[in-house]
Curated annotation (Swiss-Prot):
It is found in: Endoplasmic reticulum membrane; Nucleus. Keywords: Activator, DNA-binding, Endoplasmic reticulum, Membrane, Nucleus, Stress response, Transcription, Transcription regulation, Transmembrane, Transmembrane helix. Signal peptide: none annotated. The chain crosses the membrane at residues 499-519. It is a single-pass membrane protein. It comes from Arabidopsis thaliana. GO terms for cellular component: cytoplasm; endoplasmic reticulum membrane; nucleus. This is NAC domain-containing protein 13. Its main location: endoplasmic reticulum. GO terms for molecular function: DNA-binding transcription factor activity; transcription cis-regulatory region binding. It holds the Pfam family NAM. The NAC domain includes a DNA binding domain and a dimerization domain. Interacts with RCD1. Residues 388-419 are annotated as: Disordered.
Length: 528
C-alpha cells in the first residue's frame, strides 16, 4: 500500500502514528523475522550516513508529517558499542533507557538521542531528536537466533519547535485547505430509486466478498427474490416520506374504557360535604381569622348532625365524664408501669402507709373547710364539690354542669357510688405519677404546717435533721438565735435587770432630796 501524496494520499486527519509497542512488536519484530508487512510505511536507510535535514527525503512515504521512521543496520565500532557519528556531527544519548512492555513482559528497549553539530565532545546541541528501538533479548530468543537478525534497529526522527521538553507537541502534517479545494467539484449523484435492504435479508451475497457497487444483473435478481420472500415491507424509495412507514397502533379496548371513565365522571354528581366540612367552610369566610357571632348560630343543628341528642347536657357533661374516665383507665395502666420502674418503687410499705394518714388528714381539712364553687355568668352553669381523697369517709361526686336555675347539690343521688369510684380512680392515678415535688411548699403535709403557722404569726425556719423517722423539724427564728447565743443571752439579761433597778433607786433618791429641799426652804417641818 502506497501512502504517498502523489498517488492519492490520505484524507485530512489520517496519519501514520504507531505506538512504541506497535513499533517493536509488529514492525521491528516482523522485519527481523523477515515477515511481510501489510503496509510498507517504513523504509530501510542508514541514518548515520546523512544529516538530519537530509533524512525526510529518504523516507518511504511522502505525507509531509514531521516525523519519519527508518529501519537501519546497527554499525558496531568497538564490540557492543555502536558508532553514532555522521559527517557533520554525532548523535548523543540523553536520559535513561526505557523498557517497552507488552502483556506485562519486556519486548524492547527505547533510547533517546539528540543530534549535536560538530565534533565530540564540543558539538552544538540541536532540536533534532531520534528514538532508537531495539528488540529485547528474551524476545530475540523467541525469534530463533541472535546472529544476524538482531542487526536491525528501528529509528523515529523528528524536530522539536524549540529547546527544552515539548510534551504534547504534535508532529502531524500541516493542513492546507487549498489542496482539497478541487474536491468540491466532485458531486455525488444519488439514484432516484435506491433500494434499501433490511437487516433481515440473508447476507450470503455479502459473504462472497461482493461490494454493493459490484452487483450484476443476476445478483440483483437473486436479491429481489429474497426480498419478496421476507414478510412485511422491506423496501423503501427515497422519494417516499419516512412518515408513511411509521404507524402508531392503539389498543381499542383500553381506549374505549378510558373514554367511558371520563364520561362517567362528568355525569355523576359531586359528593355532598359532611357536617364537619360545612362547619369548616362556613367559619372564617371573611378571611380575618376571627370567629364572628354569626358562626355560633345554628350550632345545635351541627351537633345534632354529629349524633348528639342534647348538646348542652350530653356533649358537655356525659361525653366529658365518660371520655375522661375511659382515657383515665388506659393511662392509669401505663403510668403504673412507669411508676414501678421509677425510684419511688424503692420505698417500703411502712413508709407508704405512714404517708397516707397525713395526706388524708390534710385533704380532709381542706375539703371540710370550704367547697369550690365557680359561677359562669356567661353560660349560666354551676359546678359544685369535687371528690375527696379515698379513705376519708367523706362523700362527694362530680356533678354534670346544667343550665342555671336547676339545683345541683343533691348529695343523696343514686350515682353517689359511681362518683366515689371515679374519685378513687383519680387519686389512684395521681398516686401512680412518679413525680417528685419541685418545692417544699408543694408537699401536702409541709403545706399543711405552713397554713397553720401562717395563722399563728411569726416566721419559722425549716431545719432537716437526720432522725430515725425522717421527720422535718420546724424552729422559729427566735429559737434558733437562742440556741446560738446560749448562756451569753442569760448574762446580758441579768445585767440589764440590775441596771434597771439601780436607775429606779437613783430616781427615787433624787425625788426624795428634792422634796426635802423644798420643805426646808419654806420653814415647814418635815414630819407631819
Amino acid at each position: 500500500m502506497d501512502l504517498s501524496v502523489e498517488n492519492g494520499g490520505l484524507a485530512p486527519g489520517f496519519r501514520f502514528h504507531p505506538t512504541d509497542e506497535e513499533l517493536v512488536v509488529y514492525y521491528l519484530k516482523r522485519k527481523i523475522r523477515r515477515k511481510k508487512l501489510r503496509v510498507e510505511a517504513i523504509g530501510e536507510t542508514d541514518v548515520y550516513k546523512f544529516d538530519p535535514e537530509e533524512l525526510p527525503e529518504k523516507a518511504l512515504y511522502k505525507t509531509r508529517d514531521r516525523q519519519w521512521f527508518f529501519f537501519s543496520l546497527r554499525d558496531r565500532k568497538h564490540g557492543s558499542r555502536s558508532s553514532r557519528a555522521t559527517e557533520r556531527g554525532y548523535w548523543k544519548a540523553t536520559g535513561k533507557d526505557r523498557v517497552i512492555h507488552c502483556d506485562s513482559r519486556p519486548v524492547g528497549e527505547k533510547k533517546t538521542l539528540v543530534f549535536h553539530r560538530g565534533r565530540a565532545p564540543n558539538g552544538e546541541r540541536t532540536n533534532w531528536v531520534m528514538h532508537e528501538y531495539t528488540l529485547h533479548k528474551e524476545e530475540l530468543k523467541r525469534c530463533g537466533g541472535e546472529d544476524v537478525k538482531d542487526a536491525y534497529v528501528l529509528y523515529k526522527i523528528y524536530k522539536k519547535s524549540g529547546s527544552g521538553p515539548k510534551n504534547g507537541e504534535q508532529y502531524g502534517a500541516p493542513f492546507i485547505e487549498e489542496e482539497w479545494a478541487e474536491d468540491d467539484d466532485d458531486d455525488v449523484d444519488e439514484p432516484a430509486n435506491q433500494l434499501v435492504v433490511s437487516a433481515s435479508v440473508d447476507n450470503s451475497l455479502w459473504g462472497k466478498g461482493l461490494n454493493q457497487s459490484e452487483l450484476d444483473d443476476n445478483d440483483i435478481e437473486e436479491l429481489m427474490s429474497q426480498v419478496r420472500d421476507q414478510s412485511g415491507p422491506t423496501l423503501q424509495q427515497n422519494g417516499v416520506s419516512g412518515l408513511n412507514s411509521h404507524v402508531d397502533t392503539y389498543n381499542l379496548e383500553n381506549l374505549e374504557e378510558d373514554m367511558y371513565l371520563e364520561i362517567n365522571d362528568l355525569m355523576e354528581p359531586e359528593p355532598e360535604p359532611t357536617s364537619v366540612e360545612v362547619m369548616e367552610n362556613n367559619w372564617n369566610e371573611d378571611g380575618s381569622g376571627l370567629l364572628n357571632d354569626d358562626d355560633f348560630v345554628g350550632a345545635d343543628s351541627y351537633f345534632l348532625d354529629l349524633g348528639v341528642t342534647n348538646p348542652q347536657l350530653d356533649f358537655v357533661s356525659g361525653d366529658l365524664k365518660n371520655g375522661f374516665a375511659q382515657s383515665l383507665q388506659v393511662n392509669t395502666s401505663l403510668m403504673t408501669y412507669q411508676a414501678n420502674n421509677n425510684q419511688f418503687q424503692q420505698q417500703s410499705g411502712k413508709n407508704q402507709a405512714s404517708n397516707w394518714p397525713l395526706r388524708n388528714s390534710y385533704t380532709r381539712q381542706i375539703n371540710n373547710g370550704s367547697s369550690w364553687v365557680q359561677e359562669l355568668n356567661n353560660d349560666g352553669l354551676t359546678v359544685t364539690r369535687f371528690g375527696e381523697a379515698p379513705g376519708t369517709g367523706d362523700s362527694s361526686e362530680f356533678l354534670n354542669p346544667v343550665p342555671s336555675g336547676i339545683s345541683t347539690t343533691n348529695e343523696d343521688d343514686p350515682s353517689k357510688d359511681e362518683s366515689s369510684k371515679f374519685a378513687s380512680s383519680v387519686w389512684t392515678f395521681l398516686e401512680s405519677i412518679p413525680a417528685k415535688p419541685a418545692y417544699a411548699s408543694e408537699n401536702p403535709f409541709v403545706k399543711l404546717n405552713l397554713v397553720r403557722m401562717s395563722t399563728s404569726g411569726g416566721r419559722f425556719r425549716f431545719t432537716s435533721k437526720s432522725t430515725g423517722n425522717n421527720v422535718v423539724v420546724m424552729d422559729s427564728d427566735s429559737a434558733v438565735k437562742r440556741n446560738k447565743s446560749g448562756g451569753n443571752n442569760d448574762k446580758k439579761k441579768k445585767k440589764n435587770k440590775g441596771f434597771f433597778c439601780l436607775s429606779i433607786i437613783g430616781a427615787l433618791c433624787a425625788l426624795f432630796w428634792v422634796i426635802i429641799g423644798t420643805m426646808g426652804g419654806s420653814g415647814r417641818p418635815l414630819l407631819w
